[in-house]
Regions:
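Regulatory nucleotide-sensing modules
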Residues: 1-40, 52
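Cyclic-nucleotide recognition modules
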Residues: 47-89
Length: 89
């Protein structure tokens, strides 16, 4: 448990920040604490939103794949990120 906690950090983003994009290596999973982020597919087509208290980025970590969507902030946002690639629970 202490290994998990030492790898958790808070991160703040300004509106319009790209958190990750399609094809990026999967290095972090996130828990959105404040505001929302948009999910974009190829050609920047919006396919959804991630809201407060939702997790994102975990699928690519668990499947050991590159990012399949782009995530971008719509407002100034805050999240918790876990910096370990894979965790055993």
């Amino acid at each position: 448990m202490s290994d998990i906690l030492k790898n958790i950090n808070s991160v703040n983003w300004k509106s319009g920040t790209t958190i990750y994009k399609i094809g990026d290596e999967a290095d972090f999973a996130y828990l959105l604490e404040k505001e929302e982020v948009e999910v974009l597919s190829k050609n920047s087509v919006r396919v959804g939103f991630i809201n407060e208290k939702e997790v994102f980025g975990e699928q690519s970590i668990l499947l050991n794949t590159k990012r399949t969507v782009t995530i971008k902030t719509t407002k100034d946002s805050v999240a918790i990120k876990n910096s370990q690639k894979k965790q055993s629970l």
